[in-house]
């Protein structure tokens, strides 16, 4: 038997207009229903080709199909983190608490310094991609990353806990080519409760995956 499970588009945890005025409804609808859904369909299409190849029904260009899967799967995962990483104004925004705040203070010298560095990373991603705050299970520290496309420069082992999409489809209808203003306004909808939960999960579960049994 040859069979792979398929991916599904997750629902948003809020209405499409919930992040206004910082991200308008039109962007959210297009981004979720069209762009994210395209990555789900792309990942599933790659899996279907691999299934048919294994069954002997077709021959595939393995390299091309694997590249398609990597790109689309990563796009699906990044967006699946991105949506709950945000919350409507009043629930989102402000500053973090808990372990996230402690690590930011210890590593970056305070929230404002962290925010400035993360913002600079997101604003200067070459081409299209993501700004990422990830947990390093080996050192139990936070890392700021620039990810190009969805899967280029993503470092194996690091666990994303906060991401911002800086592909043009995430902001162009509202901010045109002003990525910087989009990034600055995005901080008003960051869901720090979600980030804290992701950090706790990573602290509890990620480290054993990358260390040899004692």
UniProtKB/Swiss-Prot annotation:
Keyword Transport included in the entry's annotation: no
Binding site for Mn(2+): 31, 79, 165, 169
Keywords on record: Iron, Manganese, Metal-binding, Oxidoreductase
EC number from the UniProt entry: 1.15.1.1
A single MF term (Gene Ontology): identical protein binding
Residues that hold Fe(3+) according to the record: 31, 79, 165, 169
Cofactor: Mn(2+); Fe(3+)
InterPro entries, sorted: Fe/Mn_Superoxide_Dismutase, Mn/Fe_SOD, Mn/Fe_SOD_BS, Mn/Fe_SOD_C, Mn/Fe_SOD_N, Mn/Fe_SOD_N_sf, SOD_C_sf
Chemical reaction(s) catalysed: 2 superoxide + 2 H(+) = H2O2 + O2
Cofactor binding description: Binds 1 Mn(2+) or Fe(3+) ion per subunit.
Domain of life: Archaea
Family: Belongs to the iron/manganese superoxide dismutase family.
PANTHER family: SUPEROXIDE DISMUTASE 2, SUPEROXIDE DISMUTASE [MN], MITOCHONDRIAL
Protein's job: Destroys superoxide anion radicals which are normally produced within the cells and which are toxic to biological systems. Catalyzes the dismutation of superoxide anion radicals into O2 and H2O2 by successive reduction and oxidation of the transition metal ion at the active site.
Protein name (record): Superoxide dismutase [Mn/Fe]
Species annotation: Aeropyrum pernix (strain ATCC 700893 / DSM 11879 / JCM 9820 / NBRC 100138 / K1)
């Amino acid at each position: 038997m040859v069979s792979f499970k398929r991916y599904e588009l997750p629902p948003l945890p809020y209405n499409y207009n919930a992040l206004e005025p910082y991200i308008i409804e039109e962007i959210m609808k297009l981004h979720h229903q069209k762009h994210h859904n395209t990555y789900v369909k792309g990942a599933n299409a790659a899996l279907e080709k691999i299934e048919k190849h294994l069954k002997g029904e077709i021959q595939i260009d393995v390299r091309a199909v694997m590249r398609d899967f990597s790109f689309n799967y990563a796009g699906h995962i990044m967006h699946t983190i991105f949506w709950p990483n945000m919350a409507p104004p009043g629930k989102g925004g402000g500053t973090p608490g808990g372990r996230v705040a402690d690590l930011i203070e210890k590593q970056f010298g305070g929230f404002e310094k962290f925010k400035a560095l993360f913002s600079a990373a997101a604003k200067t991603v070459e081409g299209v991609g993501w700004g990422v705050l990830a947990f390093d299970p080996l050192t139990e520290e936070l890392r700021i990353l620039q990810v190009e496309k969805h899967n280029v420069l993503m470092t194996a082992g690091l666990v994303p806990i906060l991401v911002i999409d800086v592909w043009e489809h995430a902001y162009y209808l509202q901010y045109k080519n002003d990525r910087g203003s989009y990034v600055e306004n995005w901080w008003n909808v960051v869901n720090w409760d979600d980030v804290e939960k992701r950090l706790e999960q990573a602290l509890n579960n990620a480290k054993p995956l990358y260390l040899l049994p004692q």
